[in-house]
């Protein structure tokens, strides 16, 4: 490990953390491309497994801040996280069976979808009472939890862009509570994915720790600037959406070129 590679890895983690802190979501989807094409990880599966470590750590760190502010609806969050772990385990198990370049091609298509969603802006939901019929809430939450957990595990991503609207759909909770509550699931799905990949030696722990250090530093800076640029939040989301789409095109091109070579 050279000083240059250390700086590149921490810097890449810092970019992801900065985007997460500034925009509140979506940034973690850049982790795998950065690990592959900037840090220099050659195995797509190791890149996915390693990014899952960073995603999980950053999510749990942000969960503490949201919980302190009272943004977490714990009943819905716990149900979603626990049930979704089954989906995350199945999704990550299937993902490891797929050829790395084919998985990257699908990942690039997913990135393009996320970029388009960021261009549209985050959906909102009307205010709802927290206390619903327990059976109804559990059934709706469990169903979407398994699906989003599977997608999160399959691609090794946080999946906040999937989990937030899923929680809103299942519980009708306000968006700020969905964001805070989603972090428990994001962290847990990332942890399950990490453990599953680690069983097959598909996690580079050294790079993961360096990436996390950068993510925490960048996240702190992004959070500080978030308030200052709050009036431009929608514009920032759209600009970042364009960046995600551009990276998606590159990922699709690289993976497709490898498949047809």
From Swiss-Prot:
InterPro entries: TM_pro_TauE-like, TSUP/Inactive_protease-like. The chain crosses the membrane at residues 6-26, 29-49, 78-98, 99-119, 150-170, 175-195, 205-225, 239-259. Its main location: membrane. It is a multi-pass membrane protein. Induction: Repressed by BigR. It is found in: Cell membrane. Keywords: Cell membrane, Membrane, Transmembrane, Transmembrane helix, Transport. One of its GO terms (cellular component) is plasma membrane. Part of an operon that comprises bigR, blh, XF_0765 and XF_0766. Belongs to the 4-toluene sulfonate uptake permease (TSUP) (TC 2.A.102) family. This is Probable membrane transporter protein XF_0764. It comes from Xylella fastidiosa (strain 9a5c). The lineage of its organism: Bacteria, Pseudomonadati, Pseudomonadota, Gammaproteobacteria, Lysobacterales.
């Amino acid at each position: 490990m050279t000083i240059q590679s250390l700086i590149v890895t921490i810097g890449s983690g810092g970019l992801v953390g900065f985007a997460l802190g500034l925009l509140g979501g979506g940034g973690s989807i850049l982790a795998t491309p950065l690990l592959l094409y900037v840090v220099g990880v050659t195995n797509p599966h190791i890149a996915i497994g390693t990014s899952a470590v960073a995603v999980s750590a950053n999510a749990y760190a942000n969960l503490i801040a949201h919980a302190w502010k009272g943004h977490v609806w714990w009943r819905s969050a716990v149900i979603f996280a626990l049930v979704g772990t089954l989906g995350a385990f199945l999704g990550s198990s299937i993902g490891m069976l797929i050829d790395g370049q084919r998985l990257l091609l699908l990942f690039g298509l997913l990135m393009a979808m996320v970029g388009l969603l960021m261009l549209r802006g985050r959906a909102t939901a009307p205010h709802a009472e927290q206390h619903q019929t327990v059976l109804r809430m559990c059934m709706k939450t469990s169903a979407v939890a398994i699906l989003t957990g599977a997608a999160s595990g399959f691609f090794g991503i946080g999946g906040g862009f999937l989990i937030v609207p899923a929680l809103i759909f299942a519980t009708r909770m306000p968006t700020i509570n969905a964001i805070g509550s989603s972090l428990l699931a994001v962290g847990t799905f990332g942890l399950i994915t990490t453990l599953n990949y680690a069983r097959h030696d598909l996690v580079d722990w050294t790079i993961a720790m360096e990436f996390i250090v950068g993510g925490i530093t960048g996240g702190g800076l992004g959070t500080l600037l978030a308030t200052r640029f709050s009036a431009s939040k929608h514009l920032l989301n759209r600009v970042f959406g364009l960046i995600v789409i551009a990276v998606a095109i590159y990922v699709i091109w690289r993976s497709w070129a490898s498949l047809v070579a």
